[in-house]
């Protein structure tokens, strides 16, 4: 075997690990099923010159100096602040919900009272989760939380995950907190930016290093075999270290059953207008079918001579063999699914030359910065192994 490592998947996790290993002198082959690198962050320029993200909106944001210093080696960071809205009962309100939301749905006297109670009961905190507010001892706080839960969280969860809120892992409901101020940005991290030339360009620079070769349009699973007697994974019948970033259940032929993932379908529309909506992303929890609309001329701001590009986003059940919905985007985190994943994880640990990393392989709902940090930390633990 001419390679020291086979890396399955050319997304962030695979690309970063390939780069770090190549810098240490290893020979790497990246095998990617799709016809492009960059995973779900892949972007392209449409016919009107608009940079569009094929698999939905991504923004780099992190509080980690390590992540920022690493990733900005491969891109020119353009400062950006994500702004989102949600449409509730026909009213566009900031998302995450903030004090403006209270002003929009309460009269001035009750709004002032509720804002004061929130500040008194969560002192010094910039935000609070709807889960915490639903458990509050203050009736007015509970009522407001219930209003938001019924009008947004519950409906959005049902569409996004095809589950009721009580079925999903609480961490999912906590991803979008309620802001205890008039702050109207989606993230409040130390760093938030977009790569000036796009995510595909950034990923290309990551893997552009001596010792890295890339195969696109190749399903690595057609070349991988599992030998339980030797506790070894083979690639084209040869033993080689394999870093796998795909779906762990698929790797092992669904030996312990299928893990649930959600997929997405996008309806992209080029529109002859300067602006379609107020902000980059608008959520529609009460609308049937789609969950949100992304306007890409606002991610980041792009002036494209009277044209814009919007994407209606429809969550659907993942099915590898379907015409649409055949890309796994999100692991569906429930108590049952996580127990099943742990069975796969324990089984995978038997194979000495197999390393797992990434949202699908780790069965975790990672943000981009978490994937970057996970790959860097994993590499550090591999130093003796490499």
Predicted features by range, described:
Residues 3-30, 379:
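N-terminal Rossmann-like FAD-binding beta1-loop-alpha1 element of flavoenzymes
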Residues 38-40, 88-89, 94-96, 161, ...:
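Short catalytic/ligand-binding loop motif for oxyanion handling, primarily in non-cytosolic enzymes
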Residues 326-386:
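C-terminal catalytic lobe of FAD-dependent flavoproteins
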Residues 48-122:
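Dinucleotide-binding Rossmann-like beta1-alpha1 core, especially the glycine-rich loop
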Residues 24, 221-347:
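Mid-domain catalytic core of redox enzymes
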